Amino acid sequence: MRRRLLAFGTAFTTIGTAGFLGFGVAAADDTKPVDPAPGGAHAEAPSMGTPGRGYALGGAHVLGIPYDEYIMRTGADWFPGLDRQIVDYPAGQVQGHTLERLFPGIGALGERFMPGLGLDGPSYGESIDVGAPNLINAIRQGGPGTVIGLSEGASVLDEVQARLAYDPAAPPPDSLSFATYGNPVGKHAFGESFLTQMFPVGSVVPSLDYRIPAPVESQYDTYQFVSAYDSIADWPDRPDNWISVANAIVGLATGHTAVAFTNPSMVPPQNIRTTVNSRGAKDTTIMIPEEHLPLVLPFKYLGVDKDTLNKLDGVLKPYVDAGYSRNDDPLTAPITVDPVNGYDPAAVTAPATQAAFGGGTDPVSQLLAGLQYVVNNQPAPKP
């Protein structure tokens, strides 16, 4: 029952959308399902990264997620064999910067009732300012390796690459690689982030206390991992398409974090693109498809059969994809939904959640396990 309640809202929206377009679920029988990658071919595990250390930074520190476990598992199937270490930084949350300024004193009130809730604290920008020197110091002490950042952590990587770009004391180009997952200010081969579309370079995002950085040509190879339709890293470049926007908003919940736990078998070859910059460094984009559209995935968690899910994808996907200019030419468009090899966000996230909290593999069990952990392991209130 709880599982159904969790998915009901999104499922209802999807049904309404399909109905508005004149294609009910039952009427989808004549709709061609979304095709998987041609011939079932998917990418071999490419040779990526720099051996040695794995310098890892997570996203915003949110209650109810196994934070350290997530960081240590980020990109583990893409960059195996690294000697991983967590690079500490504040990892401030949006509400921590915003709410305390709108409602002075709310942070202290929140700490009384739920320590660690984060109603006050360092901003996104302040977190980057602390994280960048921490990461540079870790690299100088630890030596060669691959630097991995998820979400907010990716912004720390951007700042570090900018600082090292023309630093004569920077490590040699062949001693470091950088890998971002769900970069909030990333521009990739198939599109770009919400923030870079909405805010010009040099402008400050008020709720983040963060200035949009100018692009920098790094001397280090960079890998950008993007979950298709993640509203943070893969915002529609035609935002007047409300179906694309709705799908991307749900894509934040389904794929923004889960992309960190994917593996090469989930990616068709045409979703990997590499360019070489003027300094000889490679910039590789890896776009990873989910097995269904974010708007459709909740139906899977409601128990809807695979055939119906594929038909729903077939109904909605042309409308969703119209919001992205990358799909104008079918010959160069990436595969963004793959019902055969695409990833299930709940399934790829479950091992990290179970390792930290226990519980089942379904989304509701993971959520409840996280909430139970928060209730049972609250830090002591501040005096």
UniProtKB/Swiss-Prot annotation:
**Database matches in InterPro entries:** Acyl_transf_PE, PE-PPE_C
- Quote the disruption phenotype from the UniProt entry: Change in bacterial surface properties resulting in lack of sliding motility, altered biofilm formation, rough colony phenotype, slower growth rate and enhanced susceptibility to antimicrobial drugs including rifampicin and erythromycin. Loss of trehalose polyphleates (TPP) production.
User: Where would one find coiled-coil regions in this protein?
Assistant: none
Q: Could you say which residues form the signal peptide?
A: 1-28
One Pfam annotation, family name? PE-PPE
- Pathway the protein takes part in: Glycolipid biosynthesis
* UniProt subcellular location: Cell envelope; Secreted, Cell wall
* Entry keywords, A to Z: Acyltransferase, Cell wall, Lipid biosynthesis, Lipid metabolism, Secreted, Signal, Transferase
Induction / repression? By lipidic substrates. Expression is induced approximately 50-fold in the presence of Tween 80 and 2-fold in the presence of tributyrin.
What post-translational modification does the entry describe? Proteolytic cleavage of the signal peptide is required for export to the cell envelope and for production of trehalose polyphleates (TPP).
Function text: Acyltransferase involved in the biosynthesis of trehalose polyphleates (TPP). Catalyzes the transfer of phleic acids onto 2,3-diacyl trehalose (DAT) to form TPP, high-molecular-weight surface-exposed glycolipids consisting of octoacylated trehalose with seven C36:5 and C40:6 polyunsaturated fatty acids (phleic acids) and a C14-C19 fatty acid residue.
What is the protein name stated in its UniProt record? Answer: Acyltransferase PE
User: Where does this protein come from, organism-wise?
Assistant: Mycolicibacterium smegmatis (strain ATCC 700084 / mc(2)155) (Mycobacterium smegmatis)
